[in-house]
Amino acid sequence: MPLNKESKQAVVAEVAAQVAKAQTVVLAEYRGIAVGDLTKLRAKAREQQVYLRVLKNTLARRAVEGTPFAPLAEQMTGPLIYGISEDAIAAAKVVNDFGKTNDKLIIKAGSYEGKVMDKAGVQALANIPSREELLSKLLYVMQAPVSGFARALAALAEKKQGEETAA
């Protein structure tokens, strides 16, 4: 069903609002993917706070005009699904992970910090650990010396207690 002018303007405004707050935009070709699989992809995207939408390319081009993602307009050809996220790696991770299990989803391009990336760039971005993963690793590294010191003190106290009991 064709969209009327007001509907198109509403779609462009909605997508432009998402793009304005985004750090990353990923484009992927979805030709031949079953509806059930696309539903799973959308559910995974929602979990990760990724705005995922199939758009007409002309509407997407209008939505990215005047933004750091404008250079992506050249890549907007064919049936594309757009992943947009405020998190730097979430969109790339969701699309890349789904692409590993479904070979019909083909990453075309992406943009991060105003730079256009090819498929390899999007995959490299997706392989970076998330902020939460990095923070948990940092916390572990910071806690390791403290917990080791605490265990050493406990062992020393236990040893002294054993000596006092034996004496």
UniProtKB/Swiss-Prot annotation:
Pfam family of this protein, just one?
Ribosomal_L10
Q: Which domain of life is it from?
A: Bacteria
Assigned GO CC terms: ribonucleoprotein complex; ribosome
Single GO BP term: translation
Task: Name one molecular function that GO assigns to this entry.
Answer: large ribosomal subunit rRNA binding
Per UniProt, the keywords (alphabetical) are: Ribonucleoprotein, Ribosomal protein, RNA-binding, rRNA-binding
Subunit and interaction comment: Part of the ribosomal stalk of the 50S ribosomal subunit. The N-terminus interacts with L11 and the large rRNA to form the base of the stalk. The C-terminus forms an elongated spine to which L12 dimers bind in a sequential fashion forming a multimeric L10(L12)X complex.
Similarity comment: family membership: Belongs to the universal ribosomal protein uL10 family.
Quote the PANTHER family the UniProt record gives: 39S RIBOSOMAL PROTEIN L10, MITOCHONDRIAL
User: What job does the chain carry out?
Assistant: Forms part of the ribosomal stalk, playing a central role in the interaction of the ribosome with GTP-bound translation factors.
Tell me the HAMAP family matching this sequence.
Ribosomal_uL10
Identify this protein by name: Large ribosomal subunit protein uL10
In which organism is this protein found?
Paraburkholderia xenovorans (strain LB400)
